Amino acid sequence: MLLFGESRPGAGGQEEVRAQLKERVIMSPLAAKRLAILLERGIRDYESKYGALESEAVRTNKESSEPAAMQEPPGHAIEELQEKAEALFQLIKTLGLEVGYERSFKISDKSLLANRFLLGFSKKSIQRKAREKIIDICVRMGMPDPFLEDFSEKLSEANYVHFGFEEDEGTSVYKAYLEFYDKIEKEIRSRPGKSESFLLHLGYKWDPSNHRKRALTKYTWHPSLSFEQIRKRTAHILDPRKYGPPFEIAGGILDLASQKIPHQDVLYLEVTEGNNPRRSFDINMYRANLQLKELYRLLSKLCEHYSIPLDEFRNLYDRVETKTFGHVSGGISRKGADFLTIYYGVEGYRITTD
């Protein structure tokens, strides 16, 4: 059922907001599910460029509503980034597109890795020769041949593409993701009334200095789970009997989000890779519009558990505390170690070569 109405200020100038309902539309379950997918896609399209709907709008020039050209990622002097990270930015600049720029930091035992980012865009935003330009970036990134063949084959089914970089302990990783919202919508139309999971992303990840170190990652979306169902599924991945602190901290973040948004606004994914122990979850809560500073207590406990010096954490936290929290990923790494990763601050930028 859809309800339409107007919001009005509460009586006496208080912060209370009242809703006056005017109309309602009753839909079949299939129509409602299709509408939910379309709304989800539209909102994610917007948020991939501008951030959460209720957060501050993308930075603009005073004279224009267009996003300012980004010559380097804010908060990171380009000379401080490693050569491979800078090379990826230069490749994306050749597209001349507005992209979503998202950062993250990964915490595990005695390790805090913060040199991580994703650059994402809609395939349709490339007006000419989109396929050729995207494949060219993959080639110039040095994507391994087996990945390049598979990526090229599946690119036609994707509607979003993301490229990323992360600094790992003693090495670095390039990443390329395909996102399949359009394909999911078609699957739902072809199989009405069925509740199931969907492959939302494929992630191609490799060490640019050693192509033997590579992994194909599958991100499976489980729609419309309740908060309790999400907690139960995360417990199967990050067993609280063995990994109590990170499990409880991820749950604490979910609790904070649950106070601001319904469970339908949470995007829950499970992550797997073939031939290694990697298994994790990803809980996207951008719509809760939480700032990282609201997670400080939980993040401090996480650093204490993983033996991260407080000054090392504060050096990162003090620069990003007002950024919008996005999603938390947690589970078991390829090496069999537990971890949590915090994603934050997706913003829209126009990256140009000018």
Each model region followed by its residue ranges:
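Positively charged, low-complexity terminal tracts
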Residues: 1-65
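Structured alpha/beta or helical-core interaction and ligand-binding surfaces enriched in interleaved
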Residues: 66-354
